[in-house]
Amino acid sequence: MRWKNKKIPEGEFMEMREEILQTWPTGKDVDLKESIDYLKKIPPEKNFAIKLEQADKEGITTAQPRAGVPLLDEHINLLQFLQDEGGADFLPSTIDAYTRQNRYEEGEAGIEASKKAGRSLMNGFPAVNWGVGPCRQVLEAVNLPLQARHGTPDARLLSEIIHAGGYTSNEGGGISYNVPYAKAVSIEHSIMCWQYADRLVGFYEENGVHLNREPFGPLTGTLVPPSVAIAVGVIEALLAAEQGVKSITVGYGMCGNMTQDVAAVISLREITKDYMKKFGYKDMCITTVFHQWMGGFPADESRAYGLISLGSTTAALSGATKVIVKTPHEAFGIPTKEANAGGIKATKMVLNLLKGQRYPDSRVLAQEIELIKAETKCIMDKVYEIGGGDLVEGTIKAFEAGVIDIPFAPSQYNAGKVMPARDNDGCIRYLMPGNLPFTKDILDFNRGKLEERAKADKREVDFQMSVDDVYAVSSGVLVGRPAKR
């Protein structure tokens, strides 16, 4: 029998928790009742859900970096620097690669190796290895809300530790933290794991603790058309709502054409709210997060700042509640704290200048919103149809059939038949739609837009367009044109 989209009964959930908390020694320090009391004492300005909702009411776009190092004191120093020097509105703990794959013994070895070397030898903060107490030390050392950001298909123990440790938001989902990150984890297993993470948040919510959940919007971060990304975000939001989550931040990764990106953020918010209403989820707070460019970055620092500023502009004009900040060292790997703060400051400058402004209405914007909503509806309708009305069943079958198909994903459970490319204006269209359940009108529109570009490029509509587009932005252009001979 497959897992279903049903709220996990409390008794069954508590039995599951006993097993999960035994998977690493730090799990024994999680005490739900004590954690509820601790979380209730966190002031509103350090609660992720409360602060996000306030920003949303005021129409403000906030800024959050990515950051994480393995040693506790260094991690605290890093976050304090991004808070004080960078001016971040929210703080992260980006979790290391070992923890993401539940390889806690190697995480422990990485901490010890980093201590001996006197420098970071891991790409994030191993929260499970440190445990509840040290996570609370991080929270108590800063003045801003904390969120765990990672990429973990099975984040059950991690979720227990970070929430008990005072983190009031957790990023991820059963699709977005599996298909773009893992090769051999089934959709059913990762959805089940994230239903647990969501049920934990729902339990806290039932006991008076308001926590935020954030599906990972960019997916593979490489030419992902808006409707596929939005469908995944809506599915993960609905799965979370079923488990009792009330504060959900749906996300989207910058594609590059500002009109399409603004249309996508507007559509994302409206579609998510519509589905919440349709299925009877009440008292929901839906906010949005816009991710600055997730693809290849220019190596030149000044050009990198230009790309960061474009993303900041789009985030502000789209009305996104939050923007995830990149750094000018993105092309080289893990940034210095100074470079990270520089990205935040550049972002905040743009956000402050554009405060209160919105992208003007136009016929082109309205058409793009209409198209995104129509494409997303095709996907969602088919998911519910093949699942017999059950969202989990439908999602599993949708991946099996290629009804949901994420471009450039490593997962063996992803069909990999969809290929995107930019049109002549830089909007991302479906070059090869695979088995996506679109109408003929939608398919014809996508093809027509790509034929317009092919005519301008003096070439055929083919896979080389996609290849050229993947490398274009890092070379300083949006659309990958053929090399002049």
Curated annotation (Swiss-Prot):
The gene is glmE. This is Glutamate mutase epsilon subunit. Keywords: Cobalamin, Cobalt, Isomerase. Its cofactor is adenosylcob(III)alamin. Catalyzes the carbon skeleton rearrangement of L-glutamate to L-threo-3-methylaspartate ((2S,3S)-3-methylaspartate). It catalyses: (2S,3S)-3-methyl-L-aspartate = L-glutamate. One of its GO terms (molecular function) is cobalamin binding. The keyword Thylakoid does not apply. Belongs to the methylaspartate mutase GlmE subunit family. Heterotetramer composed of 2 epsilon subunits (GlmE) and 2 sigma subunits (GlmS). GlmE exists as a homodimer and GlmS as a monomer. Pathway: Amino-acid degradation; L-glutamate degradation via mesaconate pathway; acetate and pyruvate from L-glutamate: step 1/4. The keyword Isomerase applies. Its EC number is 5.4.99.1. Adenosylcob(III)alamin binds at residues 68, 123, 180, 297, 326, 330, 334. Transmembrane segments: none annotated. One of its GO terms (biological process) is glutamate catabolic process via L-citramalate. L-glutamate binds at residues 66, 100, 149-150, 171, 177, 181.
